[in-house]
Curated annotation (Swiss-Prot):
Belongs to the actin family. This is Actin, muscle. Actins are highly conserved proteins that are involved in various types of cell motility and are ubiquitously expressed in all eukaryotic cells. CDD domains: ASKHA_NBD_actin (cd10224). It is found in: Cytoplasm, Cytoskeleton. InterPro entries: Actin, Actin/actin-like_CS, Actin_CS, ATPase_NBD. SUPFAM superfamilies: Actin-like ATPase domain.
Length: 378
């Protein structure tokens, strides 16, 4: 590795299903955070000289959402549309970070238990389209643990497209005990759209979904006792909040505030037959060796945007205490910066001097092809 490659600051790009978090290794927060959205006009452009584009990315797509059809290139943590994904990366490098990707090594993240082809294609695009000097793909949950300063713990990482529980002991992930749940922020938003429709508020288009997402983020919370909370909501107006829509209309939101997030603990609300997040964490711990369980119970790390609901830590504590053996000490760790903890972990990892030997170099890629990513990235 030549000297000038050593000096270039590595980039860290956490491509979530909902948000792209990107920045430079060594920083304590991502420089650029924008929605992982590509929007295409759904109407004919008639005014000349407007500089209309055939596609908009991120915040610009968000601000023009009234005339666009919005698509998310990443679904359930898996890239489903590579052309759009390239647009998102291009936007990240050239417009947001304003750097040349051929000069900086790039650390990317991905969800555990993703199809192998996904990371191969990522590697291929980085080296062939963007000419990266070096790159690396890391599992999101492992980075979250780095960010919390632990080497042992079970991470519940719940973003927009996928939730997963990853038990890690002394720095080793236990692949047999990793569980994945395709229930996360986007499903909750869709569920809230349905619930609001039952109330007579019609939210249908891709642009209106973004309004519902905002309602969810601003007003949603997790009830400690769901039945009790439903009673409270039915008998008093203390839980009601009002929200102003972009056109000035004001709507009131009552029990929808906590019914939405409750689906994390009761996926049957969404018509899913899977276990809730608390049971998934428990099942994941039970798949581990009996000797490591105690340490996992005491280090439950929450991360990702969907764990930002107020009250989720207390509810998680209550549910875990009910599932675990009675003498077990349970601790839920919910760091305030957990929305970005995966990115922060990547920033820490990429700036370690010992990590320099881990990068996949362009020369190695040219020799072995995309499959090298399975050899070098754990």
């Amino acid at each position: 590795m030549s000297d000038e490659e050593e000096e270039a600051t590595p980039l860290v790009c956490d491509n979530g299903s909902g948000l792209v978090k990107a920045g430079f290794a060594g920083d304590d927060a991502p420089r650029a955070v924008f929605p992982s959205i590509v929007g295409r006009p759904r109407h004919q452009g008639v005014m000349v000289g407007m500089g209309q584009k055939d596609a908009y990315v991120g915040d610009e797509a968000q601000s023009k959402r009234g005339i666009l059809t919005l698509k998310y290139p990443v679904e359930h943590g898996i890239v489903t549309n590579w052309d759009d994904m390239e647009k998102v990366w291009h936007h990240t490098f050239y417009n947001e970070l304003r750097i040349a990707p051929e000069e900086n090594p790039c650390l990317l993240t991905e969800a555990p238990l993703n199809p192998k082809a996904n990371r191969e294609k990522m590697t291929q695009i980085m080296f062939e389209t963007f000419n990266s000097p070096a790159m690396y793909v890391c599992i999101q949950a492992v980075l979250c643990l780095y960010a919390s300063g632990r080497t042992t713990g079970i991470v519940l990482d719940s973003g927009d497209g996928v939730s997963h529980t990853v038990p890690i002991y002394e720095g080793y992930a236990m692949p047999h005990a990793i569980l994945r749940l395709d229930l996360a922020g986007r499903e909750l938003t869709n569920y809230l759209m349905r619930v609001m429709c039952d109330r007579g508020y019609a939210f249908v288009t891709t642009a209106e979904r973004e309004i519902v997402r905002d309602i969810k983020e601003k007003l949603g919370y997790v009830a400690l006792d769901f039945e009790q909370e439903m009673l409270t909501a039915a008998t008093s107006t203390s839980l009601e909040k009002s929200y102003e829509l972009p056109d000035g209309q004001v709507i009131t939101i009552g029990n929808e505030r906590f019914r939405c997030a409750e689906a994390l603990f009761q996926p049957s609300f969404l018509g899913m037959e899977s276990a809730g997040v608390h049971e998934t964490v428990y099942n994941s711990i039970m798949k581990c060796d009996i000797d490591v369980r105690k340490d996992l119970y005491a280090n439950n790390v929450l991360s990702g945007g969907t764990t930002m609901f107020p009250g989720i830590g207390d509810r998680m504590q209550k549910e875990m205490v009910a599932l675990a053996p009675s003498t077990m000490k349970i601790k839920i760790i919910a760091p305030p910066e957990r929305k970005y903890s995966c990115w922060i972990g990547g920033s820490i990892l990429a700036s370690l001097s010992t990590f320099a030997s881990m990068w996949i170099k362009k020369s190695e890629y040219d020799e072995a092809g995309p499959a090298i990513v399975h050899r070098k990235c754990f």
